[in-house]
Curated annotation (Swiss-Prot):
GO terms for biological process: mismatch repair. PANTHER family: DNA MISMATCH REPAIR PROTEIN MSH1, MITOCHONDRIAL, DNA MISMATCH REPAIR PROTEIN MUTS FAMILY MEMBER. SUPFAM superfamilies: DNA repair protein MutS, domain I (SSF55271), DNA repair protein MutS, domain II (SSF53150), DNA repair protein MutS, domain III (SSF48334), P-loop containing nucleoside triphosphate hydrolases (SSF52540). Keywords: ATP-binding, DNA damage, DNA repair, DNA-binding, Nucleotide-binding. The keyword DNA damage applies. ATP binds at G610, P611, N612, M613, G614, G615, K616, S617. It comes from Legionella pneumophila subsp. pneumophila (strain Philadelphia 1 / ATCC 33152 / DSM 7513). Belongs to the DNA mismatch repair MutS family. This protein is involved in the repair of mismatches in DNA. It is possible that it carries out the mismatch recognition step. This protein has a weak ATPase activity. This is DNA mismatch repair protein MutS.
Amino acid sequence: MASSHTPMMQQYLRIKTDYPDMLLFYRMGDFYELFFDDAKRASQLLDLTLTHRGQSADKPIPMAGVPYHAVENYLARLLKKGESVAICEQIGDPATSKGPVERQVTRIITPGTVTDEALLDARKDNILLAIHTQKQKIGIAWVDLGGGRFHLQELTEEHQLNAELVRLQPAELLCKESTPLPSFCSNFAVKFRPGWEFDASNAHKLLCEQFSVTDLSAFGEQNYPTALIAAGALLAYLKTTQKQSLPHLTTLTLEQSEDYLQLDASTQKHLELFENIHGGGEHCLLSILDKTACAMGSRLLKRWLGKPLKQHAIIQTRQQAIKEIIFLQQDVSLHQLIKQCADVERIVSRIALKSARPRDLVSLLQTLTLLPAIHDELQENKSLLINEIKKEISPLPLLQQLLETAIIDNPPMLIRDGGVIAPGFDEELDELRNLSSNAHETLVKLEQEEKNRTGLSTLKLGYNSVQGFYIELSKAQAQNAPPHFHRKQTLKNVERYITPELKLFEDKVLSAQSKALAREKWLYDNLLEEIQQYIPELSDLAKSLAQLDVLVTLAERAQSLNWNCPNLVPESGIMIQAGRHPVIEPLLQERFIANDLELKPNQNMLLITGPNMGGKSTYMRQTALIVLLAHIGSFVPADKVTLGPLDRIFTRIGASDDLSSGRSTFMVEMTETAQILRQATSQSLVLIDEIGRGTSTYDGMALAYASCAFLASTIKAYTLFSTHYLELTELPKEFSCIRNVHLQASIKTGQIVFLYRVEEGCANRSYGLEVAELAGIPKEVLKLAHEHLNQIQDTQSILVQTQIIKPPTSPVLTELKKIDPDRLTAKEALDLIYKLKHLECAESIN
């Protein structure tokens, strides 16, 4: 460290050494300052003015800063950009410090570990995820620090990892340094960690410490060896960043893929579950469903959508709860109560991390006071799931009483501002406050005594945070100030003084205020520790309130959107009567055209033809969305639905170049198709909307034919296969399990009219030129296209006729077919040659 640096800069550099990969916010008075490369980076990311302070190696030291009172806004912007920040505060007293004020890092904020309410999206989980690969296994562990959830999963394929990342959308990824990562990981904030953190024995030790056990066998860890190493690395990172215990992480959830309806990354995007094709949050399935009353419910609903269940029994308990809520007309009253509840899940995490603010505790208290009313509202609902929820929504009278006596009704935002602990809670604090609060009365008394003693009519006693207490005299009377008045400050029209008596009073009052703040901070920290004993009950309460919110929301959606309860059965098949698209229907001004669908083991594929914009993709997507909604326990947009067992939903709908990994549209299309053909089973729902478009017509048709045939006859998956290759409509003649259906359209007064009805049979034309006209293609181009189309159709007609008119059979060929060459003698062979020659001559004469 350069000796030429000032003591303050030496202190900065010493602290910065421990946080090389983070932006160090170094508190200096009313600002957080950044220096050197941190300053340059922050100025770019936050659009700050880059200035300089002092020199290093004969060059000015770059500096940038942000006001401490506005720091949360700047932190939020940095976290969204994937940056991590170390907050370095002044912990020493500037008045007593001989050198630089003592400072230390008091808080580390990273994208995946942030729990501050102001820095989080209330309706999204904030996930920290670690990846470890070993022996062709991919282990992942993720934690939602704000929700107290800790999950493990073992994967075998990269596409499974991609699906999980798309579903979870982690704010931060941890992986072992020098580990090659798939290209799709570049969409996330990746932190490379030292190799020793990814160690099996270290992971076992950290996990045992976290869960206070000597053995992990109760968690089933033997089946998750790779994921456990990732979990250990994740805990090591949390230990570094949080610098304290994590009492709200009490168990591991082991994800098992066989429990869920699998949705790969492409399917999640194609079905627009969480965002539309443009990346926005509107006009997607979640936007239609999410009418939840609280943030906890919103986050849980998104988790349900991302992980649809396979087990019919669990789904049916959700259905029964929703039916009861509808029957008892409880949705409105319950939502009004839940809307008043705080985000208990995240408040609990802040209590566990000792970062809960006073208003968090007031919000928690308000929620506790609502529990009896919510519990009473649920009394008539006898469904199994609601009965379980009722058990967790029981009042917590001791905690409620503690909060009522400890915190005032409307506290300031921060404990450092004081005035948080309620009067009567602590006798010592009350005494210190009384001393401070009586200061005004004492000040008035002192002022009157000095006026009487000195006879100075303009004499006033005052106080400000800079000068402290003072006696003020006008300029005219200042010359008459008595000797015990010691001048403190000279202003334009007045002089200010201090007296020994006033100084003694000042020390006493300021000492009382300082002691009161210190006492209040100590009491508040103890209060948080006392509340921590209720973390298990509060965590269960948060889960139950969230679950109740989602069930009430699904009940409201079912009634508002005219959805019905699907029937889940053990027999194979998919039957939908009058199905509608859950996202498009609510957005339409006119009536949505409903359509039926039936797939069963011996008739498992629909080959769908019809014009572009005719509704093929809508029909396919609505089928998948109805199936997905049924598997989260929701009612569905259809008159009647019966579903047998299903394991996955696959989609191959639309495609575009994947420039980041250098893949063309056709390559993307083929990759998605390959995954379907390799992974689909007879219990999978497969949606394929056009394949083979990115190559030559014949290659494309061949690929479409082979894929269609393989899905129908070999895999036997439930398949909706749309195509513009009308030649494929001959497939039902070859495979009885395939049915032709088409979307109707007609031409009226020269314009195409889409009817959006699904009918049996195949389309007789594609209406491509009519759709092109709707799109605004110039008339001269359309005219040329029509002429060229007629030429092509005429040529194809001639070719077909040529193929159909078979030439007459040749007598020579007929005779040759009768012969077995291996049995002819030399004489017979010679006679045959003469005979064939004779036949050939006779044929030429004819």
